From Swiss-Prot:
Belongs to the MurB family. This is UDP-N-acetylenolpyruvoylglucosamine reductase. It catalyses: UDP-N-acetyl-alpha-D-muramate + NADP(+) = UDP-N-acetyl-3-O-(1-carboxyvinyl)-alpha-D-glucosamine + NADPH + H(+). It is an enzyme of class 1 (oxidoreductase). Its main location: cytoplasm. GO terms for biological process: cell division; cell wall organization; peptidoglycan biosynthetic process; regulation of cell shape.
Length: 303
């Protein structure tokens, strides 16, 4: 049974029993007991400071690397709104730095950099999602990760207190950053450098072309399903056990890139999770290697 939630009075927006499937790239998942979109950072800080401490909080980015279970999410689900989407220049004596709200799409940052002749962040065009989500999982592609470009990060803790972390404080590792306690990233400073528009444009086009040729970007998917291992790419292990194209219900292993799971139109979240767990079992049984989910799975498990 879900805990009764007493909600603080805020300037943002609450929705109860809010359907979440349309907020994820898989287009599956149940409802959130409470959905909250804060008006701004002050509103979010007040909310955190005054919410019952026993209430579970889940933070959504763009839903591009997320699987929400069919039974939905207890507690409060938070999605950062437009006030967390700003991009500004920051004066620094040593680096070219831009300040980016955590709710900003990675694609929009890459586009901003092109417009302002800033290089070094082109890889973001190949990573669906938001800046905050990218920091949380140290997302990466095409030879770069967030740890390579993050100068500092601002975050709120569970009590609404603000903290500033330098990149070294975030303990970035492959597909994760390790920090103590609950944090919601609100803003980051990213390092870039001066470059010409043609040079930046060429890099962006190359990344986008590779994505179109190698990934099922026009289907309902959530990006790489599993983390690569020390010695193998995840797709190599999935191919090795013969699961390319395999289906459970409406969920399928992509024929184009078998580390991508796709919703063929009528999949449930359970179909997708069960397919992923079948992959993990088959790979372990045949190779002794345990694949770790890269997709974040949230929500209540079915009984």
């Amino acid at each position: 049974m879900s805990t009764v939630i007493s909600l603080p009075k805020v300037n943002g927006e609450y929705r109860k029993n809010f359907k979440l499937s349309h907020l994820t790239w898989f287009k599956v998942g149940g409802i959130s007991q409470v959905f909250y979109k804060p008006k701004d950072e002050h509103d979010l800080s007040y909310f955190l400071a005054n919410l019952q401490s026993n209430i579970k909080i889940t933070v959504l980015g763009a839903g591009s690397n997320l699987l929400i279970r069919d039974n939905g999410i207890d507690g409060v689900t938070i999605k950062l709104g437009r006030s967390f989407n700003e991009i500004n220049f920051v004066k620094n004596n040593h680096y070219n730095i831009i300040s980016v709200g955590a709710g900003t799409l990675n694609y929009d940052v890459a586009k901003f950099c092109l417009q302002h002749n800033l290089g070094g962040l082109e890889f973001l065009v190949g990573i669906p999602g938001t800046i905050g989500g990218g920091i949380a999982m140290n997302a990466g592609a095409y030879g770069q990760e967030f740890k390579d470009v993050v100068y500092s990060v601002e975050a709120l803790d569970r009590s609404g207190n603000k903290h500033i972390f330098l990149s070294k404080d975030l303990n970035f590792e492959y597909r994760q950053c390790i920090v103590n306690g609950f944090l919601i990233f609100t803003k980051t400073n990213l390092i870039c450098y001066n470059d010409s528009k043609p040079s930046i444009s060429q890099k962006l086009q190359k990344i986008q072309t590779v994505r179109k040729l190698t990934q099922p970007i026009n289907q309902k998917t959530a990006g790489s399903a599993f983390r690569n291992t020390n010695n193998y790419k995840a797709w190599q292990l999935i191919d090795k056990v013969g699961l390319r194209g395999h289906s459970i219900g409406g969920a399928q292993v992509s024929n184009l890139h078998c580390n991508f799971l796709i919703n063929n139109g009528n999949a449930t979240a359970s179909d997708i999770e069960n397919l992923g767990e079948l992959i993990r079992k088959k790979v372990f049984d045949h190779t002794g290697i345990t694949l770790e989910w890269e997709i974040k799975i949230v929500g209540k498990k079915s009984l």
